[in-house]
């Protein structure tokens, strides 16, 4: 997995002068995006956006005399990708930008090689997004030197270590985002940006923010997405019944969560071979396992390495964690949405790695650590309490 860049492969493969309409059923209001481009050095420009029914639109138009126009139908604001001839697959490409489309007439002025500085008029959501970005701009400028080192690092593990230096900057920007959410409960920008915060929130925190929104935002596609994610998070939080699963382990043996019901406490460790914090935490996990295994603790490693099986097996050997059971998450990028909803990570509301879920002998979740839960110190305390009693 490439940790360095968000890619847009789906946007740059097979870019033809046609519009793809998938599941395009509920849109009812017209929009126009009329644009002008300076320093033009390519002939075509492209627009891609998702639609509430689950499909997407991929449109293209030819630039004539420095002008272009897109037309379509929407029933609510959506984030769209606008791009010309790209030099890379990164969203940092100089000919790529994101815009908030609304079902109204809009204009945009861009300069080839400087798409991120595009000027958009007519979209209220875009205006709100601009305000939010201006508030975070000073922090982003401070962060830029580290970000540049990160971009240029070719080793994924080293890049992940550099990425850890982002944390204080991200914390400052999170604070700005949450203040914006509180002051803009009727903004599509709030619901859209909330999608990127779910990994750091527990179900109560996420629900509190969601409940502050207007009905209009709750009923938007972004609002419905957040509601569904909160439900998944609740399913993987203390007090909920642990979702059942069954899979072949690393040795080809069938493993089912139900095998341990009534017999052992189970700690599910959601991790991956490429996850530096996961790997750094393995020595501590080994000490926990050795301390409590005879008292009735079982660990199950669930790895997000379905496309890197060899790396998964190598990491288990290198980190000496083959002493407990290991399975893959079951991820398949070609699966249907219904099939994806059955993934172990999805059923437990896993948004970030590492995350650990502690399950008692009755199959009830009694702890969540990392990824919207408590820290490892709380996990250690909980385990000590359990096994001092038992």
Residue ranges and their predicted role:
Residues 86-96, 106-107, 115-116, 167-241, ...:
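N-terminal targeting signals for export/organelle localization
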Residues 25-172:
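A non-transmembrane, solvent-exposed segment enriched in polar/low-complexity residues
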Residues 224-258, 329-332, 379-389:
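N-terminal "domain-start" segment that seeds a small globular fold
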Residues 1-35, 388-390:
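Bacterial Sec-dependent N-terminal signal peptides
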Residues 55-56, 241, 264, 351-353:
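Short, small/polar residue-rich loop motifs at catalytic or cofactor-binding pockets
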Residues 321, 331-387:
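Thiol/disulfide oxidoreductase modules built on the thioredoxin-like
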Residues 280-322, 333-344:
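Structural microenvironment flanking redox-active thiols in thiol-disulfide oxidoreductases
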């Amino acid at each position: 997995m490439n940790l360095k860049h968000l890619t847009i492969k789906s946007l740059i493969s097979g870019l033809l002068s046609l519009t793809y309409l998938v599941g395009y059923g509920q849109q009812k209001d017209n929009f126009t995006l009329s644009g002008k481009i300076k320093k033009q050095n390519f002939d075509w420009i492209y627009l891609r956006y998702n639609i509430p029914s689950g499909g997407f639109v991929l449109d293209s138009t030819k630039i004539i005399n420095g002008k272009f126009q897109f037309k379509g139908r929407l029933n609510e604001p959506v984030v769209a990708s606008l791009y010309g001839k790209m030099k890379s697959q990164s969203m940092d490409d100089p000919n790529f930008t994101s815009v908030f489309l609304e079902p109204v007439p809009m204009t945009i002025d861009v300069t080839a090689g400087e798409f991120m500085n595009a000027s958009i008029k007519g979209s209220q959501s875009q205006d709100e997004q601009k305000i939010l970005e201006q508030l975070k701009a000073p922090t982003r400028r401070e962060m830029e030197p580290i970000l540049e080192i990160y971009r240029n690092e070719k080793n994924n593990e080293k890049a992940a270590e550099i990425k850890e230096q982002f944390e204080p900057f991200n914390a400052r920007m999170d604070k700005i985002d949450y203040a914006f959410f509180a002051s803009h409960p009727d903004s599509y920008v709030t619901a859209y940006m909330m999608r990127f915060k779910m990994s750091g929130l527990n179900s109560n925190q996420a629900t509190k923010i969601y409940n502050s929104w207007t009905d209009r935002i709750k009923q938007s596609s972004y609002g419905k997405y957040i509601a569904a994610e909160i439900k998944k998070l609740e399913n993987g939080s203390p007090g909920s019944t642990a979702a059942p699963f069954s899979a072949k382990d690393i040795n080809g043996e069938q493993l089912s969560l139900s095998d341990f019901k009534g017999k052992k406490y189970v700690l599910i460790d959601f991790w991956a071979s490429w996850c530096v914090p996961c790997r750094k935490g393995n020595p501590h996990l080994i000490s926990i396992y050795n301390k409590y295994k005879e008292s009735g603790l079982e660990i199950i490693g669930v790895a997000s390495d379905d496309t890197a099986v060899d790396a998964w097996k190598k990491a288990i050997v290198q980190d000496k964690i083959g002493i407990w059971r290991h399975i893959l998450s079951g991820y398949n990028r070609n699966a249907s949405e219904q099939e994806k909803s059955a993934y172990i990570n999805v059923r437990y509301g896993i948004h970030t790695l590492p995350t650990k879920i502690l399950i008692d002998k009755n199959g009830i979740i009694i702890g969540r650590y990392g990824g919207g839960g408590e820290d490892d110190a709380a996990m250690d305390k909980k385990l000590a309490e359990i096994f001092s009693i038992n």
